[in-house]
Amino acid sequence: VCMAHGTRRDAKRLYECWGEAVARLDPNVYVACMKGRVTLDSLLPLLKSRAGERVWLLPLLSVVGKHTLQDMAGDGPQSWKHRLEQAGFVCSADLRGLADGPFFAELWMRRLDKAVSALDA
């Protein structure tokens, strides 16, 4: 389960499209948001209907911070990890943000280079 921040605004459809695209690539990977239409609450019935008892949590967030450490992987009763464990799943959390990997870091640096070049023009 990939945890995205989400939004209550019109951009929430982008998260839904992202989740649909990911599901076409791998039906065992889900995208849910902290805010929006597709949340952990809406995903839990689907997870329960699938065979398997292990869930991996992955943050779709730039950096690891409060949302990853508390909202996703924390021990509190509202954390996704805690809620999944209460639902009977064995849960593991990956504590690396998108910027920790080379792909997104390189993508952002290329965009930054373009923006700086445009300022010089």
Model region roles, listed by residue range:
Residues V1-A121:
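Extended amphipathic ligand-handling, pore-lining, and cofactor/metal-binding catalytic surfaces
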